[in-house]
Regions:
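Feature captures hydrophobic
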Residues: 1-145
Length: 145
């Protein structure tokens, strides 16, 4: 069975690739962050949510949010399935998304992808670790589809 975005096993597969690409992530720096990836439906409601924890240079945990009572994310990254799929399709094709479709660019505009957080200082971790998050997603180009 092939792991699919945003399943926890998909993020755990990225974590194994992250381990293999250790030097890249060591150059980016230590990342300690807890976040949720949310796929939003056309009605604005969460369709799927996965809790992910980066612990240093590795994915320490990934689990469906419904199976993680008490998970306290620093932020939640929200986008519709077409937005996520466009980014992942570009990564599969080119190894990275087009510049205007990166996590950073999309969050800056805030229309197609946005952040939610109850604490501005914790939300700031998104910007602090943005390149690590993008490189983690870029590893998805190495996963079977």
């Amino acid at each position: 069975m092939v792991a699919k975005f945003p399943d926890a096993v998909w993020f755990l597969a990225l974590g194994r690739l992250m381990d293999a690409e250790g030097e890249l992530f060591r150059r980016l720096g230590y990342a300690e962050v807890r976040f949720v990836v949310r796929v939003v439906g056309d009605d604005g409601r969460a369709e799927r949510e996965t809790a992910v924890e980066l612990d240093g240079y590795r994915v320490g945990r990934a689990v469906a949010l419904e199976n993680a009572p008490g998970f306290d994310p620093d932020f939640t990254i929200c986008a519709t399935a077409p937005v996520w799929n466009r980014m992942l399709d570009e990564i599969a094709r080119d190894g990275r998304p087009e510049a205007r479709h990166t996590l950073s660019s999309l969050a800056l505009i805030g229309q197609e992808l946005w952040l939610e957080s109850s604490d501005q200082l914790r939300e700031d971790k998104y910007y602090r670790y943005n390149q690590t998050l993008q490189e983690l997603l870029n590893l998805s180009g190495k996963l079977p589809r």
